[in-house]
């Protein structure tokens, strides 16, 4: 009897992706800052010069834009209940300069005090914090979320 030999397995061979392709794959999922994109490429074993060249090329072609990234972060974090101080600090960690951060913060169309009030109403109900310990708790919570003193006072009814 002839035993049939199993056919050799045909595995797909994937070409090694170029640094530009890898960077584009990251950008397709979500926006990235230049610093963040460069860091992720380096973490994936791409040479520093090749990573920088890929980021420069994608920036030049319009695939990567720090202003667009910053505006998306502001919109996302403000919608998630974070205040301007928290958002500014986060944008700073992404390697954006103060001018880019200010421009991104200017894209916010809402009112920070109203955002703080909405958060307080969701957390404490429509009546808001009633007694002093609740007001302190609410103020501390808003401060941890990055709201400034004026917004906190207005939201917790410290203003007369």
From Swiss-Prot:
Protein name according to UniProt: Regulatory protein RecX
GO biological process, one term: regulation of DNA repair
Residue ranges the record marks as coiled coil: none
Localization, UniProt: Cytoplasm
Matching NCBIfam families: PRK00117.2-1
Predominant cellular place of this UniProt entry's protein: cytoplasm
Name of the encoding gene: recX
Gene3D superfamilies: Winged helix-like DNA-binding domain superfamily/Winged helix DNA-binding domain
GO terms for cellular component: cytoplasm
Keywords per UniProt: Cytoplasm
UniProt xrefs under InterPro entries: RecX_HTH_1st (IPR053926), RecX_HTH_2nd (IPR053924), RecX_HTH_3rd (IPR053925), Regulatory_RecX (IPR003783), WH-like_DNA-bd_sf (IPR036388)
Function: Modulates RecA activity.
Any matching Pfam family: RecX_HTH2
Entry's family note: Belongs to the RecX family.
